[in-house]
Amino acid sequence: MNIETLFPLDPNVKVRTRFAPSPTGYLHVGGARTALSSWLYAKHFNGEFVLRIEDTDLERSTPEATAAILEGMEWLNLAWEHGPYYQTKRFDRYNQVIDQMIEQGLAYRCYCSKERLENLRHEQEANKEKPRYDRHCLAHHDQPTDAPHVVRFKNPQEGSVVFDDAVRGRIEISNSELDDLIIRRTDGSPTYNFCVVVDDWDMGITHVVRGEDHINNTPRQINILKALGAPIPTYAHVSMINGDDGQKLSKRHGAVSVMQYRDDGYLPEALINYLVRLGWGHGDQEIFSREEMIELFDIHSVSKSASAFNTDKLQWLNQHYMRSLPAEHVAKYLAWHMNDQAIDTSSGPALEEIIPVLSERAKTLKELAAASRYFYQEFDGYDEKAAAKNFKAEAVAPLAKLLEKLTALTDWSVEAIHDAMNATAADLEIGMGKVGMPFRLAVTGSGQSPSMDITAKLVGRERTLARIQKAIEFIQAQA
């Protein structure tokens, strides 16, 4: 039987991995961790990474889910050399191989009715036998080929399947445990396990990195590969991810979709760094650049145990990357959140200017965007607790004096604003807090903000002066 390559298989490429999601939902963090592991392993060996969309489940697969998977992969910057390939576009190839297998006695048509199979199962269960097909149709060829039927793979009945899992070590399954797998349904469509085998063969996949929920599929797929005379990839089955409570990660734990983390304000660098550390590490190192991940990652060092998802650790990493990445880079992602929160940034400081100022307090870009609103928009009122404390009648004098000094400035710089604040405190013989706190509330509407000399510089001269005047009038109106 001959391979049918989809792209030139470079003999110099020693490692070719793939990520093969089913488009029945969004790209979740478990899938993203698997994709990352597969991608890193390929990159470590200067290999190739293939993206394949396993959309044979026609009832559950949707174009929306496919688009979401591609969007998630692109957001994480997990670029692929080949693909995306769609299984639904390769049905002719799968059926060609199945027909050849029938001709060579590697597969056979099964005409058994649902009733017969149901009765067989009940009989086997009553006899405390493992339910499996009894090969009735292998011995009976008296049916016309156009009668309704499925096609079954003729699984070996003797011996066992042995493979060395890169994560879990040696695994052995007796062939007596395996059934004659259906590889083509009655409607003529090939089944998942068969399509995967042909794809891995045609795409020259050398290493299959996937979730532990696929372990049971592996011996079945290996037997089909052997029957085809195809090379057997190395398999690596990574463990599942649990929530903070030790239970399997699900929607009740919050975000599980990759793009939900984008929406919640996380940088892709933070999520990638966090995912690579789930079940793998390099000493005590917590922060990894992408180049370091590629250099150091080893699939053989991934833990067999389930990993617990820790949102606090992800937030810590996110804040680190918000502070340490170039502001111009972070600004590209922050712009999405500004738009999402309907903050018009056309009149105000550049996003690159506010990121270093606000990232000390915000853990996510979503929080940072919300905290930046006063740089770009007027606010309707003042924080009640802060106003009760800092907008008493005696606050009018320092605000008025500060307004006078700021109005006189010819240089609207951080240093000049800071000097004006100091001079106001000195002139009135009061502490800096008596100047700074009313000033902060007047300009930001809040009792918390970065240093006011920096804040006022970014808010701008006209807005700052107008807001101080508005605050003075507000205090006087309350008296």
From Swiss-Prot:
**Gene3D superfamilies registered for this protein in UniProt:** 1.10.10.350, HUPs (3.40.50.620)
Pfam families referenced in this protein's UniProt entry, alphabetically: Anticodon_2, tRNA-synt_1c
UniProt keywords, alphabetically: Aminoacyl-tRNA synthetase, ATP-binding, Cytoplasm, Ligase, Nucleotide-binding, Protein biosynthesis
Subcellular location, in the record's words?
Cytoplasm
Annotated motif 'KMSKS' region, positions? 248-252
Primary location group: cytoplasm
What is the E.C. number?
6.1.1.17
Write out the catalysed reaction.
tRNA(Glu) + L-glutamate + ATP = L-glutamyl-tRNA(Glu) + AMP + diphosphate
Q: Give GO BP annotations, semicolon-separated.
A: glutamyl-tRNA aminoacylation
Q: What class of enzyme is it?
A: ligase
'HIGH' region: where is this motif?
21-31
Write out the GO cellular component annotations.
cytosol
One function term, GO molecular function aspect: glutamate-tRNA ligase activity
Matches recorded under PROSITE patterns: AA_TRNA_LIGASE_I
Question: Which parts of the sequence bind ATP?
Answer: K251
The entry's family comment says:
Belongs to the class-I aminoacyl-tRNA synthetase family. Glutamate--tRNA ligase type 1 subfamily.
Q: Which HAMAP family match?
A: Glu_tRNA_synth_type1
**Record function comment:** Catalyzes the attachment of glutamate to tRNA(Glu) in a two-step reaction: glutamate is first activated by ATP to form Glu-AMP and then transferred to the acceptor end of tRNA(Glu).
Subunit structure, interactors included: Monomer.
The molecule here is called: Glutamate--tRNA ligase
The species this protein belongs to is Actinobacillus pleuropneumoniae serotype 5b (strain L20)
Query: What is the name of the gene encoding this protein?
Result: gltX
